[in-house]
């Protein structure tokens, strides 16, 4: 049994496989997207390492996430070009995809500066195990929340604590056990503690 308020270091696939079934209330995570990203900006690239294991859509964790989550759900960050891969994997794992939430970052991000539109959103797939009812008022599927500023980043694709707080409060009740198999900068852990979750 996993202890509340615990950080486990190790390979996420191995740790998930070793966890008990139906042991967490919600999985909220930002897995590698499979885009092999590293910033082209010299000052950012020199501070932040390339994202590990980010060459192909990393979906294998989803099957064990579906196994360990109770009658709750999974919130999975993704981006437009690999979104369908994650949706298909969530469905194959037996989860029901309920929504794709759009996170408006309020400023554009990485990408081809001259050959594509400036990306200013990320998608968050919300999938559930069994019949699951949101605990409060029905939230919108659009969340506007400023991204973490470049000078404050400690991870190349860091998520703001405020955004994670909104997601946690919309999908769980105080005391819920949250699992983030790809903790990155630890934003999910901080948001869980700030909202009275474990």
Indicate where each model-derived feature is located.
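Core catalytic lobe of class I
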Residues: 1-198
């Amino acid at each position: 049994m996993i202890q509340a308020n615990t950080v486990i270091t190790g390979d996420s696939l191995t740790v998930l496989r070793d966890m008990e079934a139906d042991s967490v209330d919600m999985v909220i995570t930002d897995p590698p997207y499979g885009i092999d990203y590293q910033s082209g900006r010299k000052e950012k690239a020199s501070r932040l390492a390339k994202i590990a294991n980010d060459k192909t859509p990393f979906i294998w964790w989803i099957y064990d996430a579906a196994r360990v989550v109770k009658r709750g759900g999974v919130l999975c960050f993704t981006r437009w070009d690999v979104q369908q891969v994650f949706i298909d994997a969530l469905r194959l794992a037996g989860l029901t995809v309920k929504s794709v939430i759009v996170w408006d970052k309020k400023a554009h991000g990485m990408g081809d500066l001259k050959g594509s539109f400036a990306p200013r959103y990320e998608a968050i797939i919300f999938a559930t195990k069994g019949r699951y009812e949101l605990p409060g008022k029905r939230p919108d599927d659009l969340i506007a929340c400023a991204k973490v500023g470049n000078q404050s980043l400690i991870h190349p694709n860091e998520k703001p604590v405020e955004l994670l707080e909104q997601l946690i409060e919309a999908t769980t009740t105080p005391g819920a056990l949250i699992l983030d198999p790809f903790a990155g900068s630890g934003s999910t852990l901080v948001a869980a503690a700030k909202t009275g979750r474990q």
